[in-house]
Amino acid sequence: MRTFNEKELVSEMEPIDTEICIKVNKANIHLGKRLLIKDLTFDIKEKEIMGIIGSNGIGKTTLAKALCGLSEKNLDVSYAKNKKERVKNSYLVLQDVDAQIFLDTVENELIFCKDKNSESDLEEIRNYLKVTDLWNKKTNHPQKLSGGQKQRLAIITSFLSNRKLIVLDEPTSGLDYRSMRIMSELIIKKAEEVPIIIITHDLELLFKTCHFVLMIGDRDYKKIAVKGNENMIMDFMNKKENLFKEAGYVK
């Protein structure tokens, strides 16, 4: 559990002005027959990291699943013509990663992501294992890892995939400050290649990592730059069912 002072939380990421590479147009997000989000429209730019915040049950994870083809048959997105293409062109790392980890060793889990397994591919895998403190676990069965280690493994797996969009659902839940910083640096580096969406309650991660944030309310939504809007974002988080407590912060 991390402690922080709200006044010390300042965005480290300047807004970027690159070409738009992903468009979502008037998306309606459902949970069963219930409409959670109506007419959601937003763009994502090349190299952009966009956070998504909102209270529990508002539809953030359901939106992530829709963007990645795991729900919503019809969705107007620029990176896929249909649900099958959404699955092919995107990668979602859920909070519960057990269902996404299935091979016999940590190393094989990552090797499986690569088509050719060239020396450069293997070197990339080795580097990820070392920087995330999984090198000494590379021959272990993934299901014997701790929750945080499994989470790191699943995120590395997404980085090794060749997709047009990566979506991370609460990638730092349960991580200490050092691990959060490492994950933030990895996300920023990977975003040079592919845009990344982060669903999070972690304000430290949001302010250290994201260029923009999509704030989803009960009846509306707004996408803004993180830099310069820290107070607005913190006010939004405070009002949405005490999200600081949901995130496990001590204030």
Which sequence ranges carry the predicted segments?
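Conserved beta-strand-loop-alpha-helix hinge in the C-terminal portion
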Residues: 1, 219-247
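Conserved ABC ATPase "signature" region
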Residues: 120-137, 159
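A short, proline-enriched helix->beta-strand linker immediately N-terminal to the Walker B motif
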Residues: 160-164
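The feature captures the beta-strand-to-loop junction immediately N-terminal to the Walker
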Residues: 53-55
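Conserved H-loop
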Residues: 194-199
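Conserved ABC ATPase signature
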Residues: 141-145
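Catalytic Walker B motif of ABC-type/P-loop ATPase nucleotide-binding domains
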Residues: 166-170
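ABC-family nucleotide-binding domains
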Residues: 176
